[in-house]
C-alpha cells in the first residue's frame, strides 16, 4: 500500500540537521513524535555519558577508574547507536499501524485480515518503545558510575545525562501505554503494563538518588 511504501520513501530522520529535525517535529505530521523524541533523549544521554568517561580517561587522580571509564565509554557509544536507530524505528512502527488502517474492509474476510494486521502492528508499536525504555534504564546504571567516579569538572554533564535518560524511559513508556489501550491480547497487555509501571518507578528513584547526591556535592 502507498502508506507502507512511505516508510521506505521517507528520509531518515537521523540524517537531518538539528534544525530540520525540529522543524519536522513541529510540522502537522504525527511523526516524528514523542516516541522518536524519547529515543533521541536516550541517544543524548548516551553521548553525554561517553563524554564524561572520555574526559576522565588519562586524567591525573583518576587512574584507579581508567579501566571502568574505558568500559563505560564503549557501552555508552554502543547504546547511542541503538537509540539512534530507534529514532526512525519508532516512526516506522507508527507508519505500519497507519498502513493497516488503510487496508480494505469491504468483505468479512477483509475485515478480519485488517483487524489482525492492526493488532499485530500495534503490538510491534508497543514493543519498540518498550525496548527503548529498557535500554534507557540500563544506561542509567552506567551514568550513575560515571557521575560518581568520573571527572568532577563534568559531573553536571553526567546529571544532564541522567535526566535525559529518565525522560527517555518515561517518554517511551507513555508510547507503550497508548498502544496497549487498543490491544485484545490481555496477557500481553498485562505483562507490558506491569513492566512499564516497575520501570517508571525504578527510573525516577535512580534519578532522584543521583541528583540528591550531586546537589549535596555542589552546595556552596
Task: Kindly label every feature range from the protein language model.
Residues 1-8:
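Short, small-residue-biased leader/transition segments that mark boundaries at the very start
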Residues 40-44, 72, 79-86, 125-135, ...:
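Amphipathic alpha-helix face/heptad-repeat signature
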Residues 51-63:
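Transmembrane signal-anchor/signal-peptide helices with a preference for the extracytoplasmic
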Residues 60-100, 199, 206:
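A structural-propensity feature for long, helix-poor, extended segments
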Residues 90, 94-163, 167:
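Amphipathic alpha-helical interface segments
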Residues 139-142, 154-214, 220:
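Preference for long, well-ordered alpha-helical segments
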Amino acid at each position: 500500500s502507498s502508506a507502507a511504501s512511505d516508510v521506505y520513501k521517507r528520509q531518515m530522520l537521523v540524517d537531518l540537521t538539528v534544525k530540520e529535525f525540529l522543524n519536522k517535529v513541529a510540522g502537522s505530521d504525527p511523526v516524528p513524535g514523542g516516541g522518536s523524541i524519547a529515543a533521541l533523549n536516550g541517544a543524548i544521554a548516551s553521548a553525554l555519558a561517553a563524554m564524561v568517561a572520555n574526559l576522565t580517561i588519562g586524567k591525573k587522580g583518576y587512574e584507579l577508574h581508567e579501566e571502568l571509564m574505558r568500559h563505560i565509554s564503549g557501552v555508552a557509544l554502543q547504546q547511542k547507536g541503538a537509540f539512534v536507530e530507534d529514532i526512525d524505528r519508532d516512526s516506522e512502527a507508527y507508519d505500519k499501524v497507519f498502513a493497516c488502517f488503510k487496508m480494505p474492509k469491504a468483505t468479512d474476510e477483509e475485515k478480519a485480515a485488517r483487524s489482525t494486521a492492526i493488532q499485530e502492528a500495534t503490538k510491534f508499536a508497543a514493543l519498540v518503545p518498550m525496548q527503548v525504555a529498557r535500554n534507557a534504564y540500563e544506561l542509567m546504571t552506567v551514568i550513575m558510575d560515571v557521575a560518581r567516579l568520573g571527572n568532577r569538572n563534568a559531573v553536571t554533564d553526567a546529571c544532564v545525562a541522567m535526566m535525559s535518560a529518565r525522560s527517555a524511559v518515561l517518554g517511551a513508556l507513555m508510547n507503550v501505554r497508548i498502544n496497549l489501550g487498543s490491544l485484545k491480547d490481555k496477557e500481553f497487555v498485562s505483562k507490558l503494563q506491569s513492566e512499564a509501571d516497575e520501570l517508571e518507578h525504578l527510573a525516577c528513584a535512580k534519578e532522584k538518588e543521583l541528583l540528591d547526591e550531586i546537589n549535596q556535592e555542589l552546595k556552596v
